[in-house]
Swiss-Prot record:
Part of the ribosomal stalk of the 50S ribosomal subunit. Interacts with L10 and the large rRNA to form the base of the stalk. L10 forms an elongated spine to which L12 dimers bind in a sequential fashion forming a multimeric L10(L12)X complex. It comes from Streptomyces galbus. Belongs to the universal ribosomal protein uL11 family. This is Large ribosomal subunit protein uL11. It comes from the Bacteria. InterPro entries: Ribosomal_uL11_N, Ribosomal_uL11_N_sf.
């Protein structure tokens, strides 16, 4: 059985180059304050 979908609680728009996402500002704090797992996103 597939995992249950999570409800969307917010929308974050970021313009970053492909493969350039890091945990450093401004990307890390922007994701962190919305509860996004930063390391999972940057993978």
């Amino acid at each position: 059985m597939p995992p249950k979908k999570k409800k969307v609680t917010g929308l974050i728009k970021l313009q970053i180059q492909a493969g350039a996402a890091t945990t450093a500002p401004p990307v890390g704090p922007a994701l962190g304050q919305h509860g996004v797992n930063i390391m999972e996103f940057c993978k």
